[in-house]
């Protein structure tokens, strides 16, 4: 309910905007009386493109109806009676919605309203003003846009009044002109009269004719002056319109597209609804002025008067047609981009939208949109207006869609839900370029009829660059191409040119954005993390981040050439880190439990003076996507230990928290946080009772050289089946080292071979899963991994 409380504190223009959101489709009374229920529902969790979510939408709608009925029944008094009637009416409307195809539209409407309500509250909270109207950092520019719209409204109303005055003046002029013609006809009739009467009538007619012709000449000049003044006013209006349209289309819309280009690298861009409202206002004002200009042309044709007006009107008519064309073609945009890494034979979706679709009657004759995939060269030719009709570089299934108008939200859009790239035709590769560096784009095109077919526009828009793959193993390298393009492409570039080199700080910004978006974490890369990455990329030992600011990173360094001494590229290693965090360790990263970006020597330096049992988690240098444990424990042979890295595959078998819980001798998370305080909330609880008579087995992390004496004496069940938080303190005498019985799990550097241990775990599982009475050979466990002290399995 907190959101509605904040919404009620809005003032001024923000309050008016919020009031406009609510209407007959979702009355503000419903929002007020069901605020707590509304804000507790998962509106954003439903995928509007997934028909399988329809049941959830219907369930939400039924819940709303039930809550409304309860609220309506409890209304008393005169005011309560009126409210009861209104709520009851909405109950009836909502009940009808349940039985039709409207639930999707209903959900879309509510999401639209709640999103914009939250936006208004957020904008109000983020800023301040002397008048008490809270606005965000962009408010000044938005205020200027709204002021210009008000100015345009006033000048358009002024030219409308001037046009009406011109029309009235011209109509009266025509009446007087007809009177002049009638007088001339009367002169012809004077020949039939006698001379005396004819002379008398002729003198009166001549006086009247002279007076009328003088008036007509003056009025003709006045009319011409009115026409010129009106044309000049239209010229000034169009100048202001062009300026406003440039701000909205070339600044605001381009900025939205730029933020959209970085999708997957930062938070989603703000809603298009504000932009659409501006574009719709532009469309209304442009169309009003166009109609005025056409009426002025009609008046000139109705009563031709020699002068410059015809040429002026032809010029402003051509200008306003250009303005309309720019508005329509520029506001045909891709709201939901297709995946930038596109795998053949895989379903994908996209959404295109016309931001002025509801204001120019485009929706009265719903247009069809077609999607095709074209190459980089074909995209260049298209932007040069070269003839590329019917050229494509592949075949997309289900590539045609009719645009739909959603009356509640006022949007005209086409949702491609089931497209699939059947085949792709590649160009000849250049030099060392791989298939994952080749870029394509999805072309969306349609034809719009504006204003009852008065104008017809061919519209086209290109998606962000797309890299086509045929196998999942190509995904990582394709993502690198997409990242480099999204981050470093210049606005207005030739498709799809990108710099071959960028400065290290530029790459830092891109990596940080990508990291936060991919891991879905507010904890980004620190200066220490970036320093580690710089040292890794440049193979440099300098410990000052500023030393790298002037260095350039080439595309080859980023993802074409292996890092010195390793068999992977910089991006492949970094992408592996993001993948393992995203899939398995995101909570621990957010908690600050994973130090991550340190090498083995740095870990040694950090731990060397710490108490025994202090450990840290770092990303492996040798394994892509590997995470390893380094810990301090003094022994006759060594005092620092490194566990062999485990990757995404091992993380899916047993969680990091459970693995750490298994190792009782790991006590403190670097620098000095008790392990259980950090990780215990993530431990998997042990089932107290058997299910269906069976006891569920567990896999536990064991390092053979670190097994406590108590565990040895307790037997195998304690070692392999128990799962409990480790003690906060583990006395040193409980450690039992086995130097006389070297174990192949630890290498000479003290690294634990997890692969061999997992072989043992799988062997145990195979034994436990065998049905009773089953016979047949079973592969023996790896030698040397089970000792008598740990018990035996039978």
Curated annotation (Swiss-Prot):
Induction: By prolactin. GO terms for molecular function: DNA binding; DNA-binding transcription factor activity, RNA polymerase II-specific. Belongs to the transcription factor STAT family. GO terms for biological process: cell surface receptor signaling pathway via JAK-STAT; cytokine-mediated signaling pathway; development of secondary female sexual characteristics; female pregnancy; lactation; lipid storage; luteinization; mammary gland development. Found in mammary gland and, in lesser extent, in ovary, thymus, spleen, kidney, lung, muscle and adrenal gland. The modification Phosphoserine is found at residue 129. Keywords: Activator, Cytoplasm, DNA-binding, Lactation, Nucleus, Phosphoprotein, SH2 domain, Transcription, Transcription regulation, Ubl conjugation. GO terms for cellular component: cytoplasm; cytosol; nucleus. SUPFAM superfamilies: p53-like transcription factors (SSF49417), SH2 domain (SSF55550), STAT (SSF47655), Transcription factor STAT-4 N-domain (SSF48092). This is Signal transducer and activator of transcription 5A. It comes from Ovis aries (Sheep). Transmembrane segments: none annotated. Residues 589-686 form the SH2 domain. Its main location: cytoplasm. Carries out a dual function: signal transduction and activation of transcription. Mediates cellular responses to the cytokine KITLG/SCF and other growth factors. May mediate cellular responses to activated FGFR1, FGFR2, FGFR3 and FGFR4. Binds to the GAS element and activates PRL-induced transcription. Regulates the expression of milk proteins during lactation. SMART domains: SH2 (SM00252), STAT_int (SM00964). The gene is STAT5A. ISGylated. Tyrosine phosphorylated in response to KITLG/SCF, IL2, IL3, IL7, IL15, CSF2/GMCSF, GH1, PRL, EPO and THPO. Activated KIT promotes phosphorylation on tyrosine residues and subsequent translocation to the nucleus. Tyrosine phosphorylated in response to constitutively activated FGFR1, FGFR2, FGFR3 and FGFR4. Tyrosine phosphorylation is required for DNA-binding activity and dimerization. Serine phosphorylation is also required for maximal transcriptional activity. The modification Phosphotyrosine is found at residues 90, 682, 694. Residues 765-794 are annotated as: Disordered. Gene3D superfamilies: EF-hand, SH2 domain, STAT transcription factor, all-alpha domain, STAT transcription factor, DNA-binding domain, STAT transcription factor, N-terminal domain.
């Amino acid at each position: 309910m907190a959101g509605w409380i904040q919404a009620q504190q809005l003032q001024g223009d923000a309050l008016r905007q919020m009031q406009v959101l609510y209407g007959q489709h979702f009355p503000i009374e419903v929002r007020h009386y069901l605020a707590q229920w509304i804000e507790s529902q998962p509106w954003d969790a439903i995928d509007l493109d997934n028909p399988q979510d329809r049941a959830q939408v219907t369930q939400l709608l039924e819940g709303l109806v039930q809550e409304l009925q309860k609220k309506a029944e409890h209304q008393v008094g005169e005011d309560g009676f009126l409210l009861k009637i209104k709520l009851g009416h909405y109950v009836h409307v909502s009940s009808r919605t349940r039985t039709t195809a409207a639930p999707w539209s209903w959900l879309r409407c509510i999401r639209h309203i709640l999103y914009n309500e939250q936006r208004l509250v957020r904008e109000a909270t983020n800023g301040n003003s002397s008048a008490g109207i809270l606005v965000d950092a962009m408010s000044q520019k938005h205020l200027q846009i709204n002021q210009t719209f008000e100015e345009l409204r006033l000048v358009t109303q002024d030219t409308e009044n001037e046009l009406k005055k011109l029309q009235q003046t011209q109509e009266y002029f025509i009446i007087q002109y007809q009177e002049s013609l009638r007088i001339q006809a009367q002169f012809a009739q004077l020949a039939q009269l006698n001379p005396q009467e004819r002379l008398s009538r002729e003198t009166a007619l001549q006086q009247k004719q002279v007076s009328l012709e003088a008036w007509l000449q003056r009025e003709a000049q006045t009319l011409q002056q009115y026409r010129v003044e009106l044309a000049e006013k239209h010229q000034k209006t169009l100048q202001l319109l062009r300026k406003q349209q440039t701000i909205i289309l070339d600044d605001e819309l381009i900025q939205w597209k730029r933020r959209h280009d970085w999708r997957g690298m930062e938070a989603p861009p703000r809603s298009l609804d504000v932009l659409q409202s501006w574009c719709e206002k532009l469309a209304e004002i442009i169309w009003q002025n166009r109609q005025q200009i056409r009426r002025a042309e009609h008046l000139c044709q109705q009563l031709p008067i020699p002068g410059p007006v015809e040429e002026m009107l032809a010029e402003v008519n051509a200008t306003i047609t250009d303005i309309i064309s720019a508005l329509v073609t520029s506001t045909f945009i891709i709201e939901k981009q297709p995946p930038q890494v596109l795998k053949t034979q895989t379903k994908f979706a996209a959404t295109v939208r016309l931001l002025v679709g509801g204001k120019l009657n485009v929706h009265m004759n719903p247009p069809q949109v077609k999607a095709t995939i074209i190459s980089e060269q074909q995209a260049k030719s298209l932007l040069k207006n070269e003839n590329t009709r019917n050229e494509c570089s592949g075949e997309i299934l289900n590539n045609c869609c009719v645009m739909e108008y959603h009356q509640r939200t006022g949007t005209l859009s086409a949702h491609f839900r089931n497209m699939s790239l059947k085949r792709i035709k590649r160009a000849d590769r250049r030099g060392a370029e791989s298939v994952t560096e080749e870029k394509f784009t999805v072309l969306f095109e349609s034809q719009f009829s504006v204003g009852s077919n008065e104008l017809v526009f061919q519209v086209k828009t290109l998606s962000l660059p797309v890299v086509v793959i045929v196998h999942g193993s190509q995904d990582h390298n394709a993502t690198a191409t997409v990242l480099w393009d999204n981050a470093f492409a210049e606005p207005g570039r030739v498709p799809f040119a990108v710099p071959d080199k960028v400065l290290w700080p530029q790459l830092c910004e891109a990596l940080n954005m990508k990291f936060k978006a991919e891991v879905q974490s507010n904890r980004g890369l620190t200066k220490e993390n970036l320093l580690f990455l710089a040292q890794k990329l440049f193979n440099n030992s300098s410990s000052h981040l500023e030393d790298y600011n002037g260095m350039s990173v080439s595309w080859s360094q980023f993802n074409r050439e292996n890092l010195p001494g390793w068999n992977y590229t910089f991006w492949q290693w970094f992408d592996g880190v993001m993948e393992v965090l995203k899939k398995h360790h995101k909570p621990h990263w957010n908690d600050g439990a994973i130090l991550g970006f340190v090498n083995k020597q740095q870990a040694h330096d950090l731990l060397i003076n710490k108490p025994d049992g202090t450990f840290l988690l770092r990303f492996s240098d040798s394994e892509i996507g590997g995470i390893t444990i380094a810990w301090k424990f003094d022994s006759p042979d060594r005092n620092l230990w490194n566990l062999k890295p485990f990757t995404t595959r091992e993380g899916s078998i047993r969680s990091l928290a459970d693995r750490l819980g298994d190792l009782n001798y790991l006590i403190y998370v670097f620098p000095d946080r008790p392990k259980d305080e950090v990780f215990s909330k993530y431990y998997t609880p042990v089932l107290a009772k058997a299910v269906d008579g069976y006891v569920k087995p567990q896999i536990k992390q064991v390092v053979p050289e670190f097994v406590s004496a108590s565990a040895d004496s307790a037997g195998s069940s304690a070692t392999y089946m128990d799962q409990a938080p480790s003690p906060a303190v583990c006395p040193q005498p409980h450690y039992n080292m086995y130097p006389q019985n070297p174990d192949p799990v630890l290498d000479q550097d003290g690294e634990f071979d997890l692969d061999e241990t997992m072989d043992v775990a799988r062997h145990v599982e195979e034994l436990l899963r065998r049905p009773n009475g089953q016979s047949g050979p079973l592969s023996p466990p790896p030698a040397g991994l089970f000792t008598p002290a740990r018990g035996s399995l039978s």
